[in-house]
């Protein structure tokens, strides 16, 4: 595996998140319904857009991402973001799963007033993202400011018929979380 510095890996990961989750049209690629993009086309279009992207750099980002944001198809010709999509091109058919008793959501304290009014909503994404442990939720919340960890009564939600899914990187997904299922 080629050697890349942390800044280069982080910038490439952010770029891939942007085009594979939100705006594939920004560089002229098309994702299929499961979010897959042809790797050769991705590299070519990224390079035309002025990004230094190679297969070796992709391999390193996929292999070293602590959150396992991206995955390759079984034949190695396509790549996708595992979850976090906002583009209407993608509708990954996640398998419904029974959640643990509690899941966690990390957010910034400045968002609490709105959450107390409306609960957790997906916003521009397709799903609300939840973590299986508080440490991961804390990292997520810290990206937006002073982190606050909310406990989600996931099993109680599931017992009321609210579905949950789990992405291949372990992130739990649901459509919304009503205020009644949150502990502050």
From Swiss-Prot:
Keywords: NAD, Transferase. Disulfide bonds: none annotated. Its EC number is 2.7.1.-. It comes from the Bacteria. The keyword NAD applies. GO terms for biological process: tRNA splicing, via endonucleolytic cleavage and ligation. Pfam families: PTS_2-RNA (PF01885). InterPro entries: Ptrans_KptA/Tpt1, RNA_2'-PTrans_C, RNA_2'-PTrans_KptA, RNA_2'-PTrans_N. The keyword tRNA-binding does not apply. GO terms for molecular function: NAD+ poly-ADP-ribosyltransferase activity; tRNA 2'-phosphotransferase activity. Coiled coil: none annotated. Removes the 2'-phosphate from RNA via an intermediate in which the phosphate is ADP-ribosylated by NAD followed by a presumed transesterification to release the RNA and generate ADP-ribose 1''-2''-cyclic phosphate (APPR>P). May function as an ADP-ribosylase. Belongs to the KptA/TPT1 family. This is Probable RNA 2'-phosphotransferase. It comes from Escherichia coli O6:K15:H31 (strain 536 / UPEC). The gene is kptA.
């Amino acid at each position: 595996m080629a050697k890349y510095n942390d800044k280069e890996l982080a910038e490439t990961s952010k770029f891939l998140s942007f085009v594979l989750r939100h705006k594939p049209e920004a560089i002229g690629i098309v994702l299929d319904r499961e979010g897959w993009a042809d790797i050769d086309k991705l590299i070519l279009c990224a390079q035309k857009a002025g990004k230094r992207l190679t297969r070796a750099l992709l391999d390193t980002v996929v292999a070293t991402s602590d959150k396992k944001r991206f995955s390759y198809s079984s034949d190695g010709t396509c790549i996708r973001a595992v979850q976090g999509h906002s583009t209407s091109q993608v509708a990954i058919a996640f398998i419904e799963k029974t959640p643990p008793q509690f899941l966690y959501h990390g957010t910034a304290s400045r968002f609490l007033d709105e959450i107390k009014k409306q609960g957790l909503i997906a916003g521009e994404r397709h799903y609300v993202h939840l973590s299986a442990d508080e440490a991961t939720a804390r990292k997520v919340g810290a990206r937006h400011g002073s982190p606050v960890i909310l406990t989600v009564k996931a099993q109680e939600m599931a017992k009321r018929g609210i579905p949950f899914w789990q992405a291949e990187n372990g992130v739990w997904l649901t459509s919304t979380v009503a205020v009644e299922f949150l502990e502050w």
